[in-house]
């Protein structure tokens, strides 16, 4: 059963890609590869929006779609599995007209409704946001500390982290607090991961001592 299902998903994505990119002969590759059915839709949308120079507009519209789907009334109207697809398509048409979405965003939502894939919408939005973040040269960085950092330490940390970036890259920093690491910090920047927490050091010490016995 898995193979036919996968084949069906591929046809849906090709259908979307063809419908939104039809005026153009060649797809624009995204700056980062995103996976799964959500990634395929997001990639096709990025290509079409890039060709039409509407990347920023589509990104804003998708964020608005995400907000709308969190509204209980909208969610009930378009995500309820017991509501007919034709009814969902009409509801979405009304929404896209009211919000004055671009044809790119409207076509995506209509196709998802017709193919019963509205449940993938948030994943597609997330995948598109990931592509756009890399497109802008943003480098995600998460720093976890046992207690909040004061302004002076935070400023110094930002300076150090930015020194690892190239001139055209932008640091996208998120600070988290987790008392369980006991002290120090854990840094994840891009695909790099450095654990300098006290908890990690204690665990390494404990392991080394056990190996000595």
From Swiss-Prot:
Q: Where in the sequence is N6-succinyllysine found? A: 90, 100, 158, 162, 199
Q: Which PROSITE patterns match?
A: ATPASE_DELTA
Per UniProt, the short sequence motif SIFI-degron occupies residue numbers 5-23
Primary location recorded for the protein, binned into one broad class: mitochondrion
Q: Name one GO biological process term.
A: proton motive force-driven mitochondrial ATP synthesis
- Classify the source by domain of life: Eukaryota
Q: Where in the cell is it found?
A: Mitochondrion; Mitochondrion inner membrane
Which key words tag this protein in UniProt?
A: Acetylation, ATP synthesis, Hydrogen ion transport, Ion transport, Membrane, Mitochondrion, Mitochondrion inner membrane, Transit peptide, Transport, Ubl conjugation
**What molecular function terms (GO) are annotated for this protein?**
ATP hydrolysis activity; estradiol binding; protein-containing complex binding; proton-transporting ATP synthase activity, rotational mechanism
Q: Which GO terms describe its cellular component?
A: cell surface; mitochondrial inner membrane; mitochondrion; myelin sheath; plasma membrane; proton-transporting ATP synthase complex
Carrying N6-acetyllysine, the residues are: 54, 60, 70, 73, 100, 158, 162, 172, 176, 192
Q: What does UniProt say on post-translational modification here?
A: Acetylation of Lys-70 and Lys-158 is observed in liver mitochondria from fasted mice but not from fed mice.
Could you point out where the transit peptide sits in the sequence? 1-23
Sorted alphabetically, which Gene3D superfamilies does this protein's record hold? Answer: N-terminal domain of the delta subunit of the F1F0-ATP synthase
Q: Give the function comment from the record.
A: Subunit OSCP, of the mitochondrial membrane ATP synthase complex (F(1)F(0) ATP synthase or Complex V) that produces ATP from ADP in the presence of a proton gradient across the membrane which is generated by electron transport complexes of the respiratory chain. ATP synthase complex consist of a soluble F(1) head domain - the catalytic core - and a membrane F(1) domain - the membrane proton channel. These two domains are linked by a central stalk rotating inside the F(1) region and a stationary peripheral stalk.
Q: Which PANTHER family match?
A: ATP SYNTHASE DELTA CHAIN
- NCBIfam families, sorted: ATP_synt_delta (TIGR01145)
Protein family (similarity comment): Belongs to the ATPase delta chain family.
Q: What quaternary arrangement does the UniProt entry report?
A: Component of the ATP synthase complex composed at least of ATP5F1A/subunit alpha, ATP5F1B/subunit beta, ATP5MC1/subunit c (homooctomer), MT-ATP6/subunit a, MT-ATP8/subunit 8, ATP5ME/subunit e, ATP5MF/subunit f, ATP5MG/subunit g, ATP5MK/subunit k, ATP5MJ/subunit j, ATP5F1C/subunit gamma, ATP5F1D/subunit delta, ATP5F1E/subunit epsilon, ATP5PF/subunit F6, ATP5PB/subunit b, ATP5PD/subunit d, ATP5PO/subunit OSCP.
Q: What is this protein called?
A: ATP synthase peripheral stalk subunit OSCP, mitochondrial
Q: Which organism is it from?
A: Mus musculus (Mouse)
